[in-house]
Amino acid sequence: MDVNLFDFHLPEEQIAQVPLLDRTSSKLMVVNRETGALRHEKFHDIVSYFNAGDTLVINDTKVLPARLFGVKEETGGKIELLLLKQTSDDVWETLAKPAKRVKPGTVLSFGDGLLRAECVEALDDGGRILKFSYTGIFYEVLDQLGTMPLPPYIHEQLEDQDRYQTVYARERGSAAAPTAGLHFTPELLQALTDKGVQLAPLTLHVGLGTFRPVSVDDVDSHKMHSEYYELPESSAKILRETRKNGGRIIAVGTTSTRTLETVIRDHGDFVEASGWTDIFIYPGQEIKGIDGLITNFHLPKSTLIMLVSALSTREHILHAYEEAVAQNYRFFSFGDAMFLTREELNR
């Protein structure tokens, strides 16, 4: 399958640079995943599309202040570092800029030595494995020294760092936010639970690979980055009961979807599970774990728009994206949302 089949024209001015003041005031495009019929709403209207007995699956990962600015201890040369994922105690896969200055044995210092790191391996893809040393608790030191790693297409400074976190973020570990969740507020979640909707949290730590373009012409040849996930038994039980009782499972975001599909494919049912997943979902594959998906509008030719197309059809999704451009929707991380559902849109 040609990657160019997932291309579309997006005016640069429709890439959202800042979040809206009210998380729930973003536009919401409701799309019937089977017919392609669509309707324009506001995100706070999404409550009306849920029924008692449905379950909303949320990714409770928390974005780390993973961008660090420091120096080489030997020369004082400036280094920018981005933490990608933890591989063992105090050991992280990172991106260093400029990478050529960071070789095995190089020692880096951040915050006048409050945090130090030694390069232990240079990876083939340009990444660097670093072992950190510090006094106290690592994440407290990181909170003090690090800054939020915004996506490369966002050029504005983010005044309130919490706006790049979901209101239910709990588990530290992501290099990027699961952005579909940014639309929810505690009040909106309460309105859903008051209606009889259950929440099923899981964790998938989002890596920067989510922003990497597909570099091959043939979609089938693309290799996904791996990300760590956990589905707790408490949530797995809710999901099993939802299916048993005829309720719908609605995933918030592609990260929740990839986690559920990983568990279903590996275990055949919703069970407690954890590990690393590099699952790549694109048209031609059946998505078994969810009935609906809440997601943002994604980059052209990205693995994310391919996943969304797998839940519907490529033609329906590209039509919806053309409509979003025509209706001046805001795109990407701080942009508007789509709700893919089987609901008839003739009411």
UniProtKB/Swiss-Prot annotation:
> Where's it found, cell-wise?
Cytoplasm
Write down the top EC class of this protein.
transferase
Q: Name one GO cellular component term.
A: cytoplasm
Gene Ontology biological-process annotations: queuosine biosynthetic process; tRNA wobble guanine modification
A Pfam entry, by short name: Queuosine_synth
Q: Which SUPFAM superfamilies match?
A: QueA-like (SSF111337)
Catalyses which reaction(s): 7-aminomethyl-7-carbaguanosine(34) in tRNA + S-adenosyl-L-methionine = epoxyqueuosine(34) in tRNA + adenine + L-methionine + 2 H(+)
Quote the EC number.
2.4.99.17
Give UniProt keywords alphabetically: Cytoplasm, Queuosine biosynthesis, S-adenosyl-L-methionine, Transferase
The molecular function terms of the Gene Ontology recorded here are:
S-adenosylmethionine:tRNA ribosyltransferase-isomerase activity
Pathway connected to this protein: tRNA modification; tRNA-queuosine biosynthesis
Role played: Transfers and isomerizes the ribose moiety from AdoMet to the 7-aminomethyl group of 7-deazaguanine (preQ1-tRNA) to give epoxyqueuosine (oQ-tRNA).
Q: Which NCBIfam families match?
A: PRK00147.1, queA
Q: How does it assemble?
A: Monomer.
Q: Indicate the family of this protein.
A: Belongs to the QueA family.
Protein name per the record: S-adenosylmethionine:tRNA ribosyltransferase-isomerase
Q: Which organism is it from?
A: Exiguobacterium sibiricum (strain DSM 17290 / CCUG 55495 / CIP 109462 / JCM 13490 / 255-15)
The gene that this protein is the product of is queA
